[in-house]
Design a protein with these regions (language model features):
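Transmembrane-helix signature of polytopic, membrane-embedded enzymes
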Residues: 50, 111-112, 260-284, 507, ...
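Perimembrane helix-loop-helix junctions
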Residues: 142-143, 342-371, 385-399
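Lumenal/periplasmic acceptor-binding loop at the mouth of the active site in multi-pass
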Residues: 197-243, 413-495, 506-509
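Short acidic/glycine- and proline-prone juxtamembrane loop motifs at membrane-interface regions
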Residues: 293-297
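Specific aromatic-rich, kink-prone transmembrane helix
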Residues: 300-317, 544
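Membrane-interface alpha helices of multi-pass inner-membrane proteins
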Residues: 322-339, 345-353, 365-370, 566-567
């Protein structure tokens, strides 16, 4: 319900809503006083985050009882309780973030909660009312497994648990001991292709460790796991970051599987057996499977992109526009994890809304305003959390370089550096983002060996080596069979695109993929290791194959099923054997 309806005199039910707001103000004031009193008592003895969390927990219990019985006067149910807990979890995270922000800006621990409450309490009112009065509990239906999903999800869970166990065992002795500093250990010793273990570092000891311009909200989204890890460290005596990261990735992987399966079933109306086959096929692709265990941001992006596609597909099927609030929330989450993927949410809104996308109120509230605010937040985050550390690191490096230069003999200092094969392409121009472009890396060989090669089938030579280590930019396959499989996959994909060229869902997914291909192959962003971005676009392959399944009949369809099944078996066999051999100790 729009907020303006609360204040419209001609709106029916206005007195009831006014009374509701008054009751909320009374209950909210009492809850705030309880929380602040407990915080003020504890903050002198324990960490301010823990003190605020204890106070919030006590006020939460009071708030739930008072909100259901007095404020909104609704029946207490399990679903409403879950929705209430979810809204308060979001509000708790927001409170911690705002509290630490004002502390960093110079306010005392006594005064910082006051502006925090001023910001967070109105947000909490909107969320609580949504879950208790507007049937917002329906959102949980998205995460409720259906009977037909139990078996494939259980099998997929078993596979992922095994792979996570192998990865954790590989780094157990290095990553679980408690240390004074964690980042260096993770960066120096973790090796899994080009994936970065930044999530391990941020959960072990929170910082804005990700690139704040490309991942502006990601560090804050994993902040609760960092707090939980601090408590587990005290209880267990080990760093549990590897387990918490695995749990997060497992959740995202399972629901990515579920959302893809539902896209095939609910939106494309595929048969159950075909939907299961194509869902399994998707996760047989090398860097989709690898992203499911890599402690990086890619699987979170896949989860959010498939959620965006699923919701958009449902609205396309109903010929309804993607709501403004839904667009706003999807953009904040998706762009907050990876900024360029936020453009895909706007594409989804454009496909579902058509010309309505350009209406001033939608363009302002759902596109321009959130994009501007997120960009400004990125710049603020850089100034507050990153800039001072970067200056200190640059100064330290300059001092070390000066010391080394003084120690080197004159002739050695004047000799040219040894020649090495260049791995970073020549940028189109210098700048905050354009310095990441690449106009010199060959496009054709990158497409064959990396974009549709390594992304789908791991190379045995230089297996899972890092480009910034010993891996060349271009690695050929040893066996012609790999090129045959790659050609089959590309041909089937193109055939599916032709068959589904009028399908709105496939058109939307293709627009997502084309955006990535334009960035990688056109501008050269990340072209030298384009395979690690596979999950940002590879879902278009099973969706195109689904359109091919829908077009064929009789013997042709049976032949296609057998071919896709054989390709899936080959990909799992090829990629899992390589991955397991890499993870097992030598």
């Amino acid at each position: 319900m729009p907020i303006k309806r609360f204040f419209n005199p001609s709106e029916p039910g206005r007195p009831q809503r006014a009374a509701e707001m008054l009751r909320f103000a009374l209950v909210g004031t009492a809850a705030v006083l309880i929380q602040y009193a407990i915080y003020a008592l504890l903050v002198c003895a324990i960490d301010h985050n823990l003190a605020m969390s204890v106070g919030y927990g006590v006020s939460f219990v009071f708030n739930f009882l008072a909100s259901t019985r007095f404020t909104f006067r609704v029946e207490r149910t399990m679903k409403r309780g879950a929705g209430f807990a979810l809204s308060h979890t979001v509000n708790w995270l927001l409170q911690l973030a705002v509290l630490n922000l004002f502390l960093r800006l110079g306010l005392s621990k006594t005064l910082a909660p006051l502006p925090m409450f001023a910001i967070c309490v109105p947000v909490n009112f909107v969320m609580v009312r949504f879950f208790l009065k507007q049937n917002g509990v329906r959102i949980f239906a998205l995460f409720q497994l259906r009977r037909e999903e139990f078996a494939p999800v259980a099998l997929f869970s078993g596979l992922l648990l095994l792979l996570h166990a192998l990865l954790i065992a590989r780094y157990w002795t290095l990553f679980t001991p408690l240390r004074a500093e964690y980042g260096t250990i993770f960066i120096r010793h973790f090796h899994l292709s080009g994936f970065d273990p930044i999530t391990y570092s941020v959960i072990s000891e929170w910082s804005a460790g990700y690139n704040v311009y490309r991942h502006p909200l990601l560090a804050f989204l994993v902040y609760p796991l960092s707090l939980l890890n601090q408590g587990l460290m005290q209880l267990t005596g080990i760093n549990c970051a590897v387990f918490l990261t695995a749990a997060l990735l497992l959740f995202c992987a399972l629901y990515s599987f579920v959302f893809l399966h539902r896209l095939l079933r609910d939106v494309l109306s595929l048969r159950l057996a075909d939907a299961r086959l194509l869902s399994a096929f998707f996760f047989s692709l090398a860097y989709v499977l690898l992203s499911a265990i890599a402690p990086d941001h890619f699987l979170l992006s896949l989860f959010l992109l498939l959620l965006t596609l699923y919701l958009s597909g449902l609205y396309l099927r109903q010929r309804a526009p993607l709501p403004t609030v839904t667009t706003l929330l999807l953009f904040i989450l998706t762009a907050g994890v990876s900024l360029n993927n936020g453009l895909k949410v706007f594409l989804a809104a454009l496909f579902t809304r058509g010309r309505g996308f350009f209406r001033p109120h939608f363009l302002l509230l759902a596109v321009l305003l959130p994009a501007a605010l997120l960009w400004q937040f990125s710049r603020f985050e850089y100034r507050q959390f990153v800039w001072a550390g970067e200056v200190a690191r640059h100064e330290a490096r300059a001092k070390q370089k000066a010391v080394r230069q003084r120690q080197l003999p004159t002739l050695q200092r004047q000799s040219p550096p040894p020649k090495t094969a260049p791995k970073m392409g020549m940028p189109m121009m210098q700048g905050e983002f354009m310095r990441w472009t690449d106009m010199s890396t060959p496009r054709l060989s990158s497409t064959v060996e990396n974009l549709f090669g390594e992304s789908f089938q791991l190379h045995r030579d230089h297996l899972l080596e890092d480009l910034f280590g010993t891996r060349p930019v271009i690695v050929p396959y040893r066996c012609v069979v790999n090129y045959v499989v790659e050609a089959l996959l590309v041909l089937l994909f193109l055939a599916g695109v032709v068959c589904g060229r009028y399908n709105r869902l496939l058109q939307l997914a293709l627009s997502f993929a084309l955006l990535d291909w334009a960035l990688h192959l056109g501008l050269g962003f990340g072209l030298n290791e384009v395979y690690i971005m596979t999950v940002h676009w590879a879902y278009v392959v099973p969706l195109a194959l689904a359109c091919l399944f829908m077009r064929l009949r009789g013997g042709s369809l049976r032949l296609l099923r057998v071919l896709v099944l054989l390709l899936t078996i080959w990909l799992y066999g090829w990629n899992l054997s390589a991955l397991v051999s890499y993870l097992l100790p030598a």
